[in-house]
Amino acid sequence: MSMVYINIFLAFILSFMGLLIYRSHLMSSLLCLEGMMLSLFIMMTVTILTNHLTLASMTPIILLVFAACEAALGLSLLVMISNTYGTDYVQNLNLLQC
């Protein structure tokens, strides 16, 4: 396993640990999720380029599309919660249920 893979895996683990530690605020959770998506994108791209997998070359682009959709939904939820309650606590998400 090369140093590139180790560093990318370490970035993923640090983002995941940040998600577990800072889960009370929505903005921190969204930033950690974006870090996880970025490390997954880089790992998939490096793996595809080193193994010359031409059939799977579209997979990182699809991952970026899903990451952009996730970020847009998360930011819209963050704006709605912060306008309604004035904070970005995740515990306010339970109040949005019908």
Swiss-Prot record:
Belongs to the complex I subunit 4L family. It comes from the Eukaryota. It is a multi-pass membrane protein. It is found in: Mitochondrion inner membrane. GO terms for cellular component: mitochondrial inner membrane; respiratory chain complex I. Gene3D superfamilies: 1.10.287.3510. This is NADH-ubiquinone oxidoreductase chain 4L. GO terms for molecular function: NADH dehydrogenase (ubiquinone) activity. Its main location: mitochondrion. The gene is MT-ND4L.
